[in-house]
Regions:
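Flexible, glycine-/basic-rich loop-and-beta segments that form/coincide
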Residues: 97-146, 150
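Acidic, low-complexity intrinsically disordered tails
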Residues: 222-240
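Single conserved hydrophobic/aromatic residue that forms the stacking wall/gate
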Residues: 1-8, 13
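Conserved Class I SAM-dependent methyltransferase catalytic core
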Residues: 39-95
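Conserved S-adenosyl-L-methionine
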Residues: 152-221
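Conserved phosphate-coordination/catalytic loops
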Residues: 36-47, 143-151
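Proline-centered turn/helix-capping motifs that create local helix->coil transitions or kinks
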Residues: 14-23, 119-127
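Mobile active-site "lid"/loop adjacent to the S-adenosyl-L-methionine
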Residues: 17-45
């Protein structure tokens, strides 16, 4: 329902859920909602998500979809059914592996790249960029089990949008897309279903950008700074 206000976004970057039932390795053992579904249910979920993305993106708007390689078939099929063009698959190469239960430990994540047909897509970089992205992963994911480095999110955003344009992230998690947009002067529309990650994102944003005011809207009313601070504090107590 909330996505109707997001129509006109110039770009979408999406991370999670991957449907791999991931659990963080920190003492908090953080998890992700909707990250363990039966195959048919997950395929339906993806089609619904990508249909919403298609509806709100402008023609020519680019997307970047991080995903698990084991679910690549579902992601590609769902993107095509929604109407998107799949142009390339980029690879985020991490500086260290992620310990798991498979024979070969994962040290990369694929990221599908393409755009909504109907207009020319933006490309703001040179012709020397490659499909291999080398960015160190965070040393500790205390905020979110799969927190992305801000520099990683800023890289494709810079390539496929311009100053002041709207970047949509409908699974914002730890808020790395929001932080990246703030650093490179884009407008970020972010959505997150889990209250603890919403609160964590707000705290992270306030710590990184203390000069920026943060205000919340509740029941259609824009709260002042003090009311916002009180609500954040109350929500933090509930989560703890």
């Amino acid at each position: 329902e909330m996505t109707s206000s997001l129509v006109g976004s110039e770009m979408c970057i999406r991370d999670r859920p991957y449907n791999v039932n991931y659990e963080g390795s920190t003492e908090e053992e953080l998890t992700i909602q909707n990250d363990s579904m039966e195959n048919d249910l997950f395929a339906t979920f993806l089609r619904q998500v990508f249909s919403v993305m298609f509806a709100v993106l402008k023609p020519g708007g680019s997307y970047y979809i991080f995903h698990a390689d084991s679910e690549g078939e579902n992601f590609r099929a769902s993107l095509r059914k929604a109407g998107f063009k799949i142009a390339q698959c980029c690879i985020w190469v991490k500086n260290t592996m992620v310990m798991g239960r498979q024979d070969y430990q994962w040290q990369h994540e694929p990221c599908l790249y393409g755009w909504k047909p109907g207009a020319g897509h933006q490309w703001n970089s040179d012709r020397k960029q490659t499909t291999v992205w080398n960015f160190d992963k965070p040393q500790r994911n205390a905020i979110h089990p799969t927190m992305k480095p801000i520099a990683l999110m800023a890289y494709p955003i810079s390539n496929s949008s311009t100053l002041g344009q709207i970047v949509l992230d409908i699974f914002s998690g730890s808020g790395s897309t929001l932080m990246a947009c703030q650093q490179i002067d884009r407008i970020c529309y972010a959505m997150e279903i889990d209250p603890k990650y919403v609160t964590a994102t707000i705290h992270r944003y306030r710590a990184m950008f203390p000069e920026q005011p943060v205000r919340l809207v509740r029941n259609g009313e824009l709260l002042d700074v003090e009311q916002t601070a009180d609500m954040i504090a109350d929500q933090n107590k509930v989560i703890q």
